[in-house]
Amino acid sequence: MFFYDWYVGLNDVIYDCIAILALGCAITCLLLILHRSALHRLHLVYADGSRRYCQFAAI
């Protein structure tokens, strides 16, 4: 009986770990996607700013 309880407890822990890992992966993926688009936007702004600066410096 003890072994059965231990097995069920272990299964609960494993399922909890899987759920936490899945949630963690989903959050990480979401953050990466958001971060990537934010980086892309930031890069566009930076590229635009540096282009203007170069034009200003060329005058």
From Swiss-Prot:
It is a single-pass type III membrane protein. GO terms for cellular component: membrane. Disruption phenotype: Knockout mutants displays reduced infectivity. It comes from the Viruses. The chain crosses the membrane at residues 13-33. Its main location: membrane. It is found in: Membrane. Keywords: Membrane, Signal-anchor, Transmembrane, Transmembrane helix. This is Protein ORF5a. It comes from Equine arteritis virus (strain Bucyrus) (EAV).
